[in-house]
Amino acid sequence: MALERTFSMIKPDATRRNLTGAITKMLEDAGLRVIASKRVWMSKREAEKFYAVHKERPFFSELVEFMSSGPTVVQVLEGENAIAKNREVMGATNPSDAEEGTIRKVHALSIGENSVHGSDSAETAKTEITFWFSEIEIVG
């Protein structure tokens, strides 16, 4: 098993409902350690840059509006196979398809307001981590 770092974000729908602690606890209970965390209010420009990979998708403008509608909590997680473990704990993008006990099954409101985002690969994790954090902010 490999010790990895991954990026996690608690989205505005969850921060509005004061779920930051509950979601972080679910991540920690799964064996992931938070080694960097901050609460940010993403600007539309930051949302456009962060989600640029989806620029041509029909939901892009709605995604940008949603992600800039309230605070998010951005985190760096560390643990054995952290990328896969985080994705497992998050559950399927559509909460109705998510496994029982996953973050999205428990907390998501809809496929759009699905409470969390997590990196899908090591390359994406590195890009997303460096988008929000400088090396000095990550304390393992």
Swiss-Prot record:
CDD domains per the UniProt record, alphabetical: NDPk_I (cd04413)
GO cellular component: cytoplasm
Active site: 117 (pros-phosphohistidine intermediate)
Matches recorded under Pfam families: NDK (PF00334)
Binding annotation for ATP: 11, 59, 87, 93, 104, 114
Listed InterPro entries: NDK-like_dom, NDK-like_dom_sf, Nucleoside_diP_kinase
UniProt-listed PANTHER family: NUCLEOSIDE DIPHOSPHATE KINASE
Name of the protein in question: Nucleoside diphosphate kinase
Lineage of source species: Bacteria, Pseudomonadati, Pseudomonadota, Alphaproteobacteria, Hyphomicrobiales
Gene assigned in the entry: ndk
